[in-house]
């Protein structure tokens, strides 16, 4: 507020990833320069010089105001640093990513039950404050952290073919198959205690469709045909459930259903973007035309309702009446 920014690590690393990936694709040097600036910001301000890892949030003077080590945030750091390494060839970026990976494995991996604890204090000691945001449950493990850690480890393994990393990536995939994906409904369970006992009943359609393609991406890289076929079947089933329950007649994917089954008809930008990718992936895996049609309708919805034709960029969300909103109130 008052034009005094509070840099958030999650946003800074996403900016880094976006411009690095854009340069990788289009070779526009302006994109690489933007990525370089974001990389310098991550290294100079967000990386903890004493304990390693990245801070969650800084004030406008680059002083930590939340120095906790949220594993969700560490995952985005790995993801973006590896992408920058791939785009620029900067060996230091990969070294930073590997350092964060080793800290996560040392401090937040659960050797008894597998999976990862949500957060830690600045010095990586255990913490009781586990929430990613005010609307999240204060539980030991979450779908969202494991999803983005799987995404980050997939990208890291693409660049760094290490047996230990492969073992952890397989373990993450199995966490989804064994615990996080409900085998009956094909929806995700969002929160758990330390021993993987479910603690929530909401359905998050955006995360469902996002997981469907990220799970597939991870297993394709692992070159395990049996695991890949199993995940491909699960991936298509998840996309099928989302298509049957969550897509409005105009192609918008509703945000979620609460524990009572009541839908939130808002359409968030990231949910809609993930639906394009997820339904396209389901079509590639199954050949079923309804998935391709859903992907096209999802993009048409973006073009009609979410792209700001006057000021550029996208609206954060539109409501059930398709009125736009710029309020960002939840993490994806």
Language-model features, listed with the residues they occupy:
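Glycan-recognition and catalytic cores of secretory/periplasmic carbohydrate-active enzymes
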Residues: 1-332
């Amino acid at each position: 507020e008052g034009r005094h920014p509070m840099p958030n690590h999650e946003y800074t690393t996403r900016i880094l990833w976006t411009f690095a990936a854009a340069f990788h694709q289009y070779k526009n040097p302006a994109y690489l320069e933007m990525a370089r600036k974001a990389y310098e910001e991550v290294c100079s301000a967000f990386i903890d010089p004493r304990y390693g890892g990245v801070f969650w949030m800084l004030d406008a003077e680059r002083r930590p105001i939340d120095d906790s080590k949220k594993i969700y945030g560490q995952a985005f750091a790995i993801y973006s640093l590896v992408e920058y390494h791939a785009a620029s060839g900067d060996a230091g970026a990969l070294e930073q990513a590997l350092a964060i990976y080793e800290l996560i494995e040392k401090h937040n991996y659960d050797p008894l039950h597998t999976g990862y604890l949500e957060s830690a204090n600045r010095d990586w000691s255990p913490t009781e404050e586990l929430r990613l945001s005010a609307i999240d449950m204060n539980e030991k493990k979450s779908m969202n952290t494991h999803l983005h850690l799987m995404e980050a480890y997939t990208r890291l393994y693409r660049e760094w073919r290490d047996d230990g990393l492969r073992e952890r990536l397989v373990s993450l995939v199995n966490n989804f198959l064994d615990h996080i994906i409900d085998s009956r409904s094909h929806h995700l369970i969002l929160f758990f205690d330390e021993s993987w006992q479910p603690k929530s009943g909401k359905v998050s359609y955006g995360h469902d469709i996002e997981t469907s393609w990220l799970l597939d991406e991870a297993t394709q890289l692992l070159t395990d045909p049996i695991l890949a076929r199993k995940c491909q079947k699960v991936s298509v089933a998840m996309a099928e459930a989302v298509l049957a329950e969550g897509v409005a007649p105009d192609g918008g994917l509703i945000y979620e259903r609460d524990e009572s089954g009541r839908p939130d008809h808002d359409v968030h930008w990231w949910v809609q973007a993930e639906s394009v990718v997820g339904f396209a992936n389901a079509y590639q895996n199954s050949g079923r035309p309804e998935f391709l049609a859903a992907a096209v309708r999802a993009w048409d919805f973006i073009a009609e309702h979410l792209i700001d034709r006057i000021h550029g960029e996208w609206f954060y969300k539109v409501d059930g009446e398709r009125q736009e909103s710029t309020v960002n109130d939840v993490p994806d």
